[in-house]
Amino acid sequence: MKFGLLGRTLGHSYSPAIHHALGNESYTLFEKEPDQLADFFADPSLQGLNVTIPYKIAAYEACQTLSDRAQKTGVVNTMVRRDGAWHGDNTDYLGFLYSLDYGHMEVAGKVCLILGDGASSHTLHIALEDLGAKEIIHLSRKTAPFYQDVHHFYHKAQIIINATPVGMYPKCPQALIDLAPFSLLEGVVDLIYNPLRTSLLLQARQLGLKAVNGLPFLVAQAVAASELFLESESLIKTEELIKSLQGDQENIILVGMPGVGKTTVGKALAQRTGRTFIDIDQEISKEIGAISNYIQTQGEAAFRQVESKAIQDIGKRGGLVIATGGGAVTIEDNFLPLRQNGRIYQLTQPLDKLATAG
């Protein structure tokens, strides 16, 4: 029997790791083109599938029976073969309910603004209706109201949910909208889980709002799907799995004065945690040669541009120990790329203890 995730492009999916942790070692990835779907669904060795964009509607149409949730939303993200026929369910619905609870967000009686109009956004809409949302508004690039009409809702929206891929790895950090003008905003949900903290979520936290990323959504829907696949209740708590995945993905970022010991500490941490260590200054030196010579010939401003580009590239990766250059934190634009996947630790030493050699 085969289980897995069906999609068109699945390069950075966490689903196999989640399902392996849930006891399904045969779970794998299936990348298919639209013209391959009919033959794929007919494969008798397939027992269970999760389905992601752009095939959730095709999955709905391929199922012979449907759960009440799937019928209500018109979307299938989980397929299970029962007596030779495909049964469809929508565990994204359950994942979204879990996310709201995880982020301590009340939507009853609230005005909710959804960014996006795809299959996932329709599931969110039905869930919000069921929870008693006062009004649900979709912004889209295809139909009105459009993203450029967002100003009409600055003094109305209380909960914002991003159901688009804008801000997802590798095109991060990016955001569709600026949260600052929203006067009644209480919380933000972003279904993106890579990076852990999108630009939208980081701004939400800076504004003191409730914020939750897509990891609780992803894990909760996967747990529900796994229970359908294996026909047994999961022995692993959803919250424990979320914390484990976040810990694996989150970078450890060391900042501090030159000579404070970032490289020494970073290498030790990497060895202890089994992570890859990256010294940003060393990575830059591979490209431009000795940093001191570059600053002398090109100027510090030119070097800071090179440094910021390196931070942009490295910061979007996950599971690393990263040592920054001493002056990296003096550039405000470096914060988002570092914080999106990282937890930042400042190393300190008395000035007379700082290393000056090298």
Which residues are covered by each model-predicted region?
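Phosphate/diphosphate ligand-binding glycine-rich loop within oxidoreductases
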Residues: K2-G103, P195-R197, L201, L207-K210, ...
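Glycine-rich adenosine-cofactor-binding loop
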Residues: G7, N90-Y93, L100, G109-A133, ...
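NAD(P)-binding Rossmann-fold cofactor-contacting core
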Residues: L131-Y147, D281-I288
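Rossmann-like adenosine-cofactor binding region
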Residues: P145-A211, A328-F335
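Adenosine-phosphate binding glycine-rich loop
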Residues: L191-E250
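Conserved lysine of the Walker
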Residues: K262
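ATP-dependent small-molecule kinase phosphotransfer cores
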Residues: Q282-T330, N334-R339
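Conserved phosphate-donor/acceptor-positioning beta-strand/loop module used by diverse small-molecule
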Residues: L338-G358
